[in-house]
């Protein structure tokens, strides 16, 4: 589990990884909310929305909204706001940030 302000509201949020039925699950719970946002990722190579292998590491990172591919949709840098990444050591990391347009976490890859 990692903690950090992912949505920019100044309160710590929690993110945790779990596994179910050959899927990697990421649960993100915002400070005061009871119901987490759940994002599923495949386990195994060849799938864009997946990790190549286990084990994986969940990390908080500095939020960067301007990438080589352009500005991330709905991304807003705020004081203390963090991004997340899921890394397996084999594939490019899955990068996640809070999209103020989507109203939740979204992911992208390099």
Residue ranges of predicted features:
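Structural motif
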Residues: 22-28, 92-96
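Acidic, divalent-cation-chelating loop motifs in proteins
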Residues: 1-9, 66
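Acidic/hydrophobic-patterned starts of short beta strands in beta-sheet-rich repeat architectures
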Residues: 8-18, 78-85
């Amino acid at each position: 589990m990692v903690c950090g302000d992912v949505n920019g509201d100044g309160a710590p949020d929690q993110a945790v990884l779990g596994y179910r039925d050959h899927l990697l699950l990421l649960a993100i719970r915002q400070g005061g909310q009871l119901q987490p946002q759940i994002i599923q990722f495949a386990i195994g190579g060849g799938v864009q929305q997946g990790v190549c292998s286990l084990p994986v590491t969940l990390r908080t990172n500095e939020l960067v909204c301007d990438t080589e591919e352009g500005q991330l949709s709905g991304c807003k840098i705020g004081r203390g706001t963090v991004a997340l990444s899921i890394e397996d050591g084999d594939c490019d990391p899955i990068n996640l940030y809070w999209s103020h347009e989507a109203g939740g976490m979204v992911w992208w890859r390099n």
